[in-house]
Each structure stands twice: as C-alpha cells, then as structure tokens.
Swiss-Prot record:
Catalytic activity of the protein: ATP + H2O + 4 H(+)(in) = ADP + phosphate + 5 H(+)(out)
Protein name in UniProt: ATP synthase subunit beta, chloroplastic
CC annotations in GO: chloroplast thylakoid membrane; mitochondrion; proton-transporting ATP synthase complex
NCBIfam families, sorted: atpD
Gene name of the record: atpB
Amino acid sequence: MRTNPTTSSPVVSTLEEKNLGRIAQIIGPVLDVVFPPGKMPNIYNALVVKGRDTVGQQINVTCEVQQLLGNNRVRAVAMSATDGLMRGMEVIDTGAPLSVPVGGATLGRIFNVLGEPVDNLGPVDTRTTSPIHRSAPAFIQLDTKLSIFETGIKVVDLLAPYRRGGKIGLFGGAGVGKTVLIMELINNIAKAHGGVSVFGGVGERTREGNDLYMEMKESGVINEKNIAESKVALVYGQMNEPPGARMRVGLTALTMAEYFRDVNEQDVLLFIDNIFRFVQAGSEVSALLGRMPSAVGYQPTLSTEMGSLQERITSTKEGSITSIQAVYVPADDLTDPAPATTFAHLDATTVLSRVLAAKGIYPAVDPLDSTSTMLQPRIVGEEHYETAQRVKQTSQRYKELQDIIAILGLDELSEEDRLTVARARKIERFLSQPFFVAEVFTGSPGKYVGLAETIRGFQLILSGELDGLPEQAFYLVGNIDEATAKAMNLEVESKLNK
C-alpha cells in the first residue's frame, strides 16, 4: 500500500517519464513494445499509451507487462480496447504495477479494473492506493484457528457452515436467488460482524451487474443519500471487456478487500461472480501470448494463477476475508479443469435448487447437496453435528419416499414413515427464512437467527414436540418461537372463520 500526496489520478514522475518505449506490433489486445537498452520494465509493470488516433480522438490505454521477449522488447496485455493504437506510438513505463484506490472511499462506488470510478458520481479519493499484485500473507501471519462464520441464515449455519476466512462455492442457475442470497450476506456481515463487502463482477453480463447495483440501492446495502455509509464496494470487468481486464479484475477487488482486513482490521466478505470467467480470461491471454495450451485447451499455468488469487484470500491475526465464489460448471462437467481446480480451494459449497425455488422456499439452498468441511464434531460440537445429521437423514428419507407418495399416496405409508414425512415437511419449511433485503418485495420483516437458536428449533421439530402444529406455521419464520406463535394465530384465525 502507498499513500499518494495528492487526490488526483496517479502521476508519472519526471524521472520515470524518461523511460519511453514505442509500439512495435499490435495483435488484438496484445502489444509488443520496444524500449531503449537497459531501460526494460519489470514483469507486471503498468504501461500507459497516450495520444490521438487518426481522427484526432484522445487515446489512453493502460497495459500490463507479461513477457520479456529479448532484443529490448516486452509483450504487454491491454486493460481496455486497443482501437486506434498504431505502431510507433509512444509508451510510458510507470515503473510500478497497477495500483487502485483502497479504504472507506471505495464503499458504495463502482470501479473498473484500473480502479477508476464508472458510476458517474465524481472522482474518488486516491490518496491511498495499493498495487494489485502482492504476495499472500506469510505463514506466521495466518490465523489457523478453525472458527465458524455465522451468517444468521439457518440453512447455511446448520447444514453447510462457512469457515471464517474460508472459500465457499455458490452453485445455482439463473433465477434461483443467487443475487438475493449474496445481498443478504452483505447485509448480515455489516450488522452482525461490523464488516464490509467487496463484489468482484468477473466476466459476467453487464445487465446483471446493473441489476445488482439497482437492487443494492433499493435494499439499502448501498446508501444513496450517504454513500460513505454503504456496506459494499463494487468492481466490474464484464463480458465485453478485453481478456486482460477480466483476468485482473478479481485481483483489483481482492486488493480492496485486503486493505479492509489488514489496515481496518475488519471481517470482509469478498464475492467473485464468476470464478470460471477468471480462468477463461487467463486462457485467452495465455493463447494470445503464444503459450502451448494444456488439458482441454486451458493455460498451462492454470493451477498457479488460481493459487496466487486464492492464497491471498485468508484469515490473518488482524482480520479475515471470507470469499463466496459463484462457480459456472461448463456443460455440467465437474471434471473440467476449471471447476476441478476451483474445488481444491473450497471449504464449503452452497447449492441452490430450482425445485425448492419452484416451491417458494427461499433461500432455495439444497440441504442434501450443500457441503462443508467445517461440519465435524470437533469443530462445531457434538450437538450441532448430531442435529445437522438428523436433519439430513430425515430430508433424505423424505426424498426416497416421494416416488411412493406420488404413486400410492400418503395413506399407504407405515406409521413411522408418515411421521418422518410430516417432520421432513416441517423441516423443509423451517429452512426458509424472511430476508432483510427482500422486505421491500415480500412485506415480511427480515430475521437474523443465531446458531444456538437454529439448533434448538430443529431439535424441537426432530424430537416430536411440535408434531401437533400445522406445517405452514414453519414457513418463512425466524426462530422456533415465531413458528409456535404463528401456529396459535392460524388456530385463532381458523376458529374465527368457522
């Protein structure tokens, strides 16, 4: 991290200004630049091309050095479109890697890969900037204690708990509630942990990025009236950007998150949507640089690139970065090198189910498909582990019986199976929960449910103490006391209707 004396955009000093090169070759987003002997820039240095194109329009393209080719040539990848660039144009070596603004000034704003605001809300304070290329924290700085990151979302905390400083894969198609779940997590970390969030939109649709921004403003995650009170910073490098920008936008978002962890000593949530696009962009850049492709056409450096990003996402003694990464699985093939490399880094998976979403059960997290390495008795305790296992067993038995119920009906089941089905249906409904960020749509006030309350609620359902209550009493409530109160209200209403 460095502190700049002025608030203007990073200025190239007169000393560095002397290190000028010339464009020798342009192939799409890749430039070859010739520098004077002995003045070669370092790998990952930012190069700036300024000038005018043939019709007199201003050009300002930032590139990143990727290879030193010999004969005083370097190969660089552009972070924006190379339209209008010509051979012979002057290139300035900035003498440092790309640096982006960090700190409280980034909250509530949208940035591109270069750390420039793109939301038309004026300039951002750039007195404090940080280079996007950093080494992962040293082993001695890490906090190796295994601790649960409580989200206040029942289904997540009970069945697939997140690790503080861990990495979670979020799997789900379009329209099953990924965005709402992401916004609820941003809201809950701000309220319960005093933390902030950084959202990295990597190679996804611009429309989705715009929708997310609008929904965040609507739900109060971004405070329009007082931007500084917002809980999230957004960094976008969408599908229409060159591969260089899509490859580096994840690092820009991570750099902003690292500042909140290391300097502000906060718990940070880092969202990456989509981690597959990071790999895809790396593959494009690798091909453009002329590297020999590896398995399925991916870059030979796939594991290294993924590792250098993922190893920076961790808990230190100052704070933590907990990362939630949306994972696109190409052609639903889990053995594809991109998702397979990602899985090696994940501590938990949250799988969203279209079947549950169709039933109106939100969050539509699949209780049987979602997993977590944290769900072990020595980490979460015997009580939590036992409750989670019994919930899964009951849900699994219900799933097995559904075919029989569809063909023969509920009456043909044994007494024991009928009881299992009744409890499983209550559990399914109790796994739903009203969200704070969905209040504006549903009219139901949001609920944050602590882990102890969650465990108590499911224990009561499994023990049979609540067998007499109607299953709709468990739908979209917070803790179990609300379910019993709702059951009483339903009883009163039914008596009045009679």
